[in-house]
């Protein structure tokens, strides 16, 4: 037998906000310097030419141009040219 009554509603009611990660600019899109290309944890995507990486692995455009995704084996690089 239960020694406590159901604690349903008093223990529920928490939910965290989504972290909004993912690709923000897709292949072929025009970007300007400073635009965020990808928000990620770890290097799922690697920075290529014209792309910088922040402390939290965010990839951003260093130059104006078009986004290009490039595969080298398992490694996916993002270039802006």
Curated annotation (Swiss-Prot):
Assigned protein family: Belongs to the bacterial ribosomal protein bL27 family.
Protein name from the UniProt record: Large ribosomal subunit protein bL27
One Gene Ontology molecular-function label: structural constituent of ribosome
GO (cellular component) term, any one: cytosolic large ribosomal subunit
Pfam family, one: Ribosomal_L27
One BP annotation, GO: translation
Location of region: Disordered: 1-22
PANTHER family registered for this protein in UniProt: LARGE RIBOSOMAL SUBUNIT PROTEIN BL27M, RIBOSOMAL PROTEIN L27
Record keyword Coiled coil present: no
Key words of the record: Ribonucleoprotein, Ribosomal protein
Entry-linked InterPro entries: Ribosomal_bL27
């Amino acid at each position: 037998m239960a020694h406590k009554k159901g604690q349903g509603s008093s223990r529920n009611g928490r939910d965290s906000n989504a972290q909004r990660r993912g690709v923000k600019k897709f292949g072929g899109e025009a970007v300007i310097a400073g635009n965020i290309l990808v928000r990620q944890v770890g290097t799922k995507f690697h920075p290529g030419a014209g792309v910088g990486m922040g402390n939290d692995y965010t990839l951003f455009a260093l130059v104006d141009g078009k986004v290009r995704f490039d595969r080298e084996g398992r490694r996916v690089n993002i270039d802006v040219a």
